[in-house]
């Protein structure tokens, strides 16, 4: 009785090991992605997590956007906390300096928008032990630079800002406490920045650039939030050298794919990272929360939805990164020359590739290393396989694509059939069929339930994965049952090699030409496929030579010439030899041969030259050899019996784990980043196609082994596929835990008192939502495409809403309705000089510190009284400005704005003066309160722009 081999290439081991590897690694990836490591019971000296959580609860009690009174209260609290921390450490001004910056302002432009902003930043400078220069010196600074740690303390008008950016703010407070401990004192100067105004246009970071201390740091750590809890990921990094310091974190998390997503605009939101790197010239990191996006900028961005574990995850990452950067005393982050464009010369880093492994290990290497490895593999791998093919041919063991072998000579009219072609085209046909099914499912979802991904991303993933696997198994198993082939595994690997070669070539081009490195998994994918196929080539050296096999066949044919079993095929349904059943030469089946064709034989073969020679040539028969062909898998070619039966498991261990980990990590990150972006106007089709493509990449390594699977696992997956298809097609796409985000704004004509409330959201759903609001009932809805460029896929529905009460009476400070007093909400006056293309406009809004001037035609010049010129900033862009945004640090203060325009093209300058109100804490915006109260449980409001209420008046010069 043959001994059972638990590692042989038979159904039992294949099903067991493949299932264990895939299920185990999928589970490990999901646990890493969906859970957060526990915070320590004994944190490092200087860190107090209980205190940090109390700070977070305090600053997130109310909405606190820049344009709100609650924002001032948060600022006062943070100043008092900073002063308290410094006081308890008994530090003087030479060691730690607190800068209450109420003087810096910035005037700049972006596209057709100009901004004048007055900052209210809080800056704390901890002098490094090896830095002696004064903090604010403009000509003497630390040669090796300092480290900037930034978070913004303003929230949006529709959210409490727990993770955006409350956790970042309390992290900065804890870093202040930590680094002012004597045993933790940094070698390099650390600048802690709590900036105000990030949510509105990255204004706070721009104002920081106007402070002389902004020239001290050369590196930075930016702390942000675009979700509500979970792990803080490394969103992006400027270079490899800086990223290595993040790798010291105990729980690193992230991949360079997110950085490329920012570069290519897949992630639309921006952070202060852009200002610090692109405008100021610093090198650093962007650490941020990223999901769930449905809670981003809503009331669910609160302490209830996050945790102390999440707080510790960001804090520990910031602590490790800052500690490492602050310990560098060399010239790594200093350029050799000073720059005359106002930027800091922080040296030049190298583009990098980085990713974590299960949230514990962080891999970092340079882009040029990736490129070199890609090119090397693309050259070495084909040459190696060509060499192995040549070696097999020299050894007479190249059964690949071999159709027949000759006993005597090539003109033998009845050669031995080898069936080397069998199975060659099988894998691409199966691969294309299975891939077509998952792509079709993507289009099916878009057609019938496009937004199910919003609440059920893992149902979509389960559908795609189970569909691809079942279809691939069905065709593979069917083909194997009809025409078994010992080369099916090897041919599948050859096709995987070809496909991954093409993929790596594309990735290499993008790496070299565009510095896009998100395709880094392709390098490892191709590498493991190359090693696996190389093992299959080496495996063939264990096969008998084709000539010896043919002689064995001839000897057996002579000995059993008169057997009655002359019609059996030349494959091993048992381990016994079947060499007497030689098919004729034209019986070599391929993938395009009919499956119903039998082994046709005629009497002519018995009159062939070989028969005559065998009957009369005793010498030849005596010279022939009988081979031990080993254990042939039932139905497969007899020459394969001596091939090692355990090579497959090495190939599986090469292919599956690395592909699952690297591709699976990218898949989870992209899912988290994109699955709730349709509410922002993103196309769901792109998301479904991305999931389909990643499903194929994840399961393609099963292709060489899938034909050995029994029906049990595929049947289970078929039922999973069937259930998830039905669910994904009929389930409602939103829920209490995954609310559809809709965008609110109220516009008031301050001249007529007319007000319009609008909600912007997904077509058909936003109409249902508005229909449930009492103020909108029995009113005709006007639903149009929004004028916001990034939300063209959405619909805006307008109706006459509840009057806003954003300006209190001067005497009793009681609110009043807009039907009588809106004319006083904002005032403007225009003074036109002697020149026809110049004018000065005085603008003031009551109970606000944010107004705008929107022009019907562009202006060419802008000068705001109190603004300071900065060569780094241009007040007006090259194509002019159509909008000027004005921000004051005090409520109700006027702006004096000088305007210049092209009088030849536009004799008159016209437009609107708009003032904004963003404070939803006091009940002064009843329409917003109504939306929050009456919205269905599956929807949630957010702000669409800087203000919740916009009051306007027309003007003409």
Curated annotation (Swiss-Prot):
Regions that span the bilayer: 11-31, 370-390, 424-444, 451-471, 491-511, 522-542, 643-663, 686-706, 714-734
Record keywords: Glycoprotein, Hydrolase, Membrane, Metal-binding, Metalloprotease, Protease, Transmembrane, Transmembrane helix, Vacuole, Zinc
Binding sites annotated in the UniProt record for Zn(2+) 2: 164, 199, 297
Record topology, Cytoplasmic segments: 1-10, 391-423, 472-490, 543-642, 707-713
GO cellular component: vacuolar membrane
PANTHER family per UniProt: METALLOPEPTIDASE M28 FAMILY MEMBER, VACUOLAR MEMBRANE PROTEASE
Protein name listed in UniProt: Vacuolar membrane protease
Provenance organism: Pyrenophora teres f. teres (strain 0-1) (Barley net blotch fungus)
């Amino acid at each position: 009785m043959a001994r059972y081999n638990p590692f042989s290439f038979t159904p039992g081991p294949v099903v067991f090991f493949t299932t264990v590897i895939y299920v185990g690694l999928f589970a490990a990836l999901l646990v890493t992605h969906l859970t957060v490591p526990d915070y320590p019971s004994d944190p490092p000296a200087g860190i107090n997590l209980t205190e940090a959580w109390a700070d977070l609860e305090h600053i997130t009690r109310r909405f606190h956007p820049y344009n709100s009174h609650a924002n001032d209260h948060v600022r006062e609290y943070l100043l008092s906390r900073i002063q308290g921390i410094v006081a308890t450490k008994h530090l003087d001004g030479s060691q730690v300096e607190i800068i209450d910056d109420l003087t810096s302002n910035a005037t700049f432009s972006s596209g057709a928008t100009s901004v004048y902003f007055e900052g209210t930043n809080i800056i704390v400078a901890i002098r490094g032990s090896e830095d002696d220069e004064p903090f604010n010196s403009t000509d003497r600074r630390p040669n090796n630079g300092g480290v900037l740690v930034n978070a913004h303390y303003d929230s949006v008008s529709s959210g409490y800002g727990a993770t955006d950016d409350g956790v970042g703010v309390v992290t900065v407070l804890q870093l202040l406490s930590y680094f002012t401990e004597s045993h933790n004192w940094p070698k390099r100067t650390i600048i802690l920045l709590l900036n105000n105004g990030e949510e509105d246009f990255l204004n706070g970071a721009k104002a920081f650039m106007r402070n002389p201390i902004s020239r001290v740091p050369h590196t930075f750590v930016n702390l942000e939030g675009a979700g509500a809890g979970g792990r803080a990921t490394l969103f992006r990094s400027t270079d490899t050298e800086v990223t290595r310091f993040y790798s010291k974190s105990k729980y690193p998390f992230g991949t360079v794919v997110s950085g490329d997503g920012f570069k290519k605009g897949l992630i639309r939101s921006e952070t202060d990272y852009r200002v610090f790197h692109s405008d100021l010239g610093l090198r650093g990191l962007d650490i941020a929360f990223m999901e769930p996006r449905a809670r981003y900028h809503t009331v669910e961005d609160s302490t209830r939805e996050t945790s102390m574990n999440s707080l510790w995850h960001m804090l520990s990452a910031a602590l490790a990164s800052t500690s490492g950067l602050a310990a560098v005393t060399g010239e790594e982050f200093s350029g050799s020359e000073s720059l005359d464009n106002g930027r800091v010369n922080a040296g030049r880093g190298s583009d990098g590739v980085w990713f974590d492994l299960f949230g514990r290990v962080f891999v970092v290497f340079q882009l040029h290393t990736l490129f070199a490895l890609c090119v090397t593999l693309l050259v070495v791998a084909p040459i190696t396989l060509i060499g192995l093919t040549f070696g097999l041919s020299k050894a007479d063991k190249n059964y690949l694509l071999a159709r027949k072998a000759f006993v005597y000579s090539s003109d033998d009219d009845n050669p031995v059939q080898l069936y080397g072609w069998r199975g060659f085209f099988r894998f691409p046909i199966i691969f294309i069929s299975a891939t077509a099914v998952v792509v079709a499912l993507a289009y099916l979802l878009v057609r019938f339930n496009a937004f199910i991904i919003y609440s059920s991303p893992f149902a979509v993933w389960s559908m795609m994965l189970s569909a691809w696997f079942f279809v691939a198994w069905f065709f593979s198993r069917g083909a194997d049952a009809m025409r078994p082939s010992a080369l099916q595994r090897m041919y599948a690997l050859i096709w995987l090699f070809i496909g991954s070669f093409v993929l790596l070539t594309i990735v290499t081009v993008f790496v070299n030409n565009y510095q896009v490195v998100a395709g880094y998994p392709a390098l490892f994918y191709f590498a493991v496929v190359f090693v696996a196929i190389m093992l299959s080539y080496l495996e063939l050296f264990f096969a008998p030579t084709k000539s010896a096999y043919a002689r064995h066949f001839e000897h057996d044919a002579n000995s059993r010439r008169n057997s009655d079993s002359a019609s059996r095929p030349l494959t091993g349904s048992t381990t016994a030899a079947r060499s007497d059943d030689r098919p004729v030469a034209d019986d070599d089946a391929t993938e395009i041969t009919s499956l119903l064709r039998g082994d046709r034989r005629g009497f002519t073969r018995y009159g062939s030259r070989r028969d005559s020679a065998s009957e009369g040539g005793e010498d030849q028969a005596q010279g022939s050899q009988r081979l031990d062909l080993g254990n042939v898998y039932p139905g497969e070619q007899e020459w394969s019996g001596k091939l090692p039966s355990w090579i497959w498991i090495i190939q599986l261990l090469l292919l599956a784990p690395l592909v699952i980990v690297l591709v699976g990590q990218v898949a989870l990150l992209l899912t988290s980043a994109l699955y709730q972006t349709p509410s922002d106007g993103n196309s769901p089709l792109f998301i479904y196609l991305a999931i389909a493509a990643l499903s194929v990449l994840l399961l393609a390594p099963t292709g060489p082994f899938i034909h050995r699977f029994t029906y049990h696992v595929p049947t289970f997956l078929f039922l999973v596929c069937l259930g998830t298809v039905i669910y994904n097609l009929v389930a409602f796409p939103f829920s209490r835990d995954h609310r559809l985000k809709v965008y609110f704004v109220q516009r008031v004509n301050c001249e007529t008192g007319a007000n319009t409330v609008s909600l912007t959201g997904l077509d058909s759903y936003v109409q249902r939502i508005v229909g449930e609001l009492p103020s909108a009932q029995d009113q005709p809805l006007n639903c149009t495409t929004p004028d916001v460029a990034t939300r063209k896929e959405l619909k805006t529905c307008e109706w006459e809403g509840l009057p806003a009460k954003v300006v209190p009476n001067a005497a009793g400070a009681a609110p009043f309705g807009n039907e009588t007093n809106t004319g006083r909400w904002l005032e403007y006056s225009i003074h036109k000089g002697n020149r026809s293309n110049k004018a000065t406009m005085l603008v003031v809004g009551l109970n606000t510190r944010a107004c705008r001037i929107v022009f019907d035609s562009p202006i060419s010049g802008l000068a705001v009284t109190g603004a300071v010129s900065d060569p780094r900033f241009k007040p007006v862009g090259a194509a002019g400005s159509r909008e000027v945004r004005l921000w004051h640090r005090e409520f109700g203060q006027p702006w004096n704005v000088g305007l210049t325009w092209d009088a030849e093209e536009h004799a008159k300058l016209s437009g609107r003066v708009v003032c904004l109100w963003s404070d939803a804490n006091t009940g002064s915006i009843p329409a917003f309160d109504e939306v929050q109260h009456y919205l269905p449980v599956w929807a949630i409001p957010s702000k669409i722009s800087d203000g919740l209420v916009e009051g306007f008046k027309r003007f003409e010069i």
